[in-house]
Amino acid sequence: MSTSRKLKSHGMRRGKNRAPHKGVKRGGSKRKYRKGSLKSRKRCDDANRNYRSHL
């Protein structure tokens, strides 16, 4: 019983999460990086790192 339950939940989770996530990642991140220059990306990373270190 536990195994079948696990499989069901796993399948449901995968179906619900995987498709939208992939779409968002493909449409948003890739396009953003392409449009924005490497410099701006680096600056964003640095800012994030500093913010994290402060916290």
From Swiss-Prot:
The modification Phosphoserine is found at residues 9, 37, 40. InterPro entries: Nuclear_transition_prot1, Nuclear_transition_prot1_CS. PROSITE patterns: TP1 (PS00541). One of its GO terms (cellular component) is nucleus. One of its GO terms (biological process) is single strand break repair. The keyword Nucleus applies. Plays a key role in the replacement of histones to protamine in the elongating spermatids of mammals. In condensing spermatids, loaded onto the nucleosomes, where it promotes the recruitment and processing of protamines, which are responsible for histone eviction. This is Spermatid nuclear transition protein 1.
